[in-house]
Amino acid sequence: QMAEERRYFQLEFDIRNHFKMGPVPYHNVIGIIPGTEFPDEYVIMSGHLDAYDVGTGGIDDGSGVSVTMEAARLIMEAGGKPKRTILVVLWAGEEFGLYGSHSWIERNKDKLDKISNMINRDGGPTVPTGMSVSEAMWEDFALVCSPINDINPEFPFKLEKSEPGEKPEKAWGTDSGPFAVEGVPTTGFQTGDPKGYNFSYGEIWHTERDLFNKSIPEYQEHASIATAVLVYGIANLDHLLSRDGYYIEKKKEPNTKKSKKK
């Protein structure tokens, strides 16, 4: 009433904030679908739980967490019993330094050689359009990915061969980065916006526009099914994916320093 009458008034607030010295304990959330034949071999699918608090994290990384969880639900709902263990991981502390993925690696060094592939979704609510895989992985991925083209003809899927890349010395800015540094394959989907929703990751990234309503339901649905197909297929191979030719082999530089005679 006072506002409608344009009357001036004063408000007084008593705001009490309480702070604790860090570090604050934070936890990864990990679901396990146990392997029936190779329980000590793994396929990882993941997204990260935290977000910049200027928005709600509906896209970064709600679009990755929701697809990861739905893919896991689809596998379980279908009665899936993978040969090797599937780890469904929602990482903690990604935005502040990849803390969750770094911590898991430090605690599980013995598992790194037994990870067939690490798939991480952290790039917006776009739809899988293809993959680029190494020569040694080609036949396995061709087999595993073949059903993806049967899901929805509106979203064609293309598999391509890639050249070996250099193994990174430092992690890039998402949770697959620390795994790549350790030599773990992190082959994931290439994604796009084939229906022209004009989604722009740059528009929402770490801003107040990172909201749930920026998600694209039909892309998210298709991504969930494609992720379930991919992860379950890799988990059911008779062998781990080959790492041959995944990274460029670094040649040892010859020792050209001459020893000094005393």
Language-model-derived ranges and their functions:
Residues 1-3, 38, 53, 91-199:
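Metal-dependent peptidase/peptidase-like ectodomains
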Residues 21, 58-66, 80, 95-99, ...:
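Soluble non-cytosolic domains of exported or imported proteins
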Residues 4, 70-80, 106-110, 150-154, ...:
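Sec-exported extracytoplasmic/periplasmic mature domains
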Residues 13-14, 49-53, 124-131, 163, ...:
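Flexible glycine/proline-enriched surface loops and loop-helix/loop-strand junctions
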Residues 28-32, 42-46, 87-90, 116-121, ...:
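Structural recognition of the beta-strand scaffold that forms the well-ordered cores
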Residues 73, 196-257, 261:
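His/Asp/Glu-rich mid-to-C-terminal helical/loop segments that flank catalytic regions of hydrolases
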Residues 42, 65, 69-72, 83, ...:
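Extracytoplasmic/secreted envelope proteins and their assembly/folding machinery
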Residues 1-58, 70-73, 77-83:
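Soluble metallo-hydrolase cores and metallopeptidase-like ectodomains found primarily
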